[in-house]
Every structure is written in C-alpha cells, then in structure tokens.
C-alpha cells in the first residue's frame, strides 16, 4: 500500500454519513480526515458489513506500521490473527507514489474512487 492517499471531500458520501451519524457523535465525526490522508489519520473504512471510522496504521512500540507484504502476512505475529479475522475495505479517491527523484505522482481512476484491501486490530 501507499504511504499516503487522498479522500476527495467532493465524493458524494451523504448516505454513508447518515449511517455514521447514527453510530458516532459529532466530535468523533469531526475526526474523519479528508484531503491528503497520512498514517495515523482517522479514515473511512467498510468492515463487518458496516461503515466505520478507524485510525490508519498499527501502533507498535510508538511506531505506526502501515505496510506489509502479502507473501509474509500469515507468518508475521502482529498481523496473523487480523489477516484471518479482521479484513476491511479502505475508501479513497486516489493515492500517491514517489519516483526515484522523490517526485510525487497521483494515481486515480476515471470515477475518482478506489478501494484498498486492509486489515485492522
């Protein structure tokens, strides 16, 4: 996964917000990040057949882990159980990748919506 992604606030998520408003108070909803999303931001995910707000990343010894390899995820203690039992979908408009010259490139689709596979604690 990328190190940053983008959630465009112009995406029509009004129906999703109606669902979230029933679950969370306004102070919690205000934590939802839009625009450029960084690790540890609160973001919109779909898990357990419901929309939820979750912090991006795994906290481990004051570090925030955001990536793993599919080839080793089943063998890594911190991810093993969650890979089996806590899958989610991360909703985004696009994501950023950097080239070897540290230039940022924005990658998106024609309809400005991308779904990433994720796991959560």
What are these regions (language model features)?
Residues 1-121:
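Short linear sequence motif anchored by a di-proline
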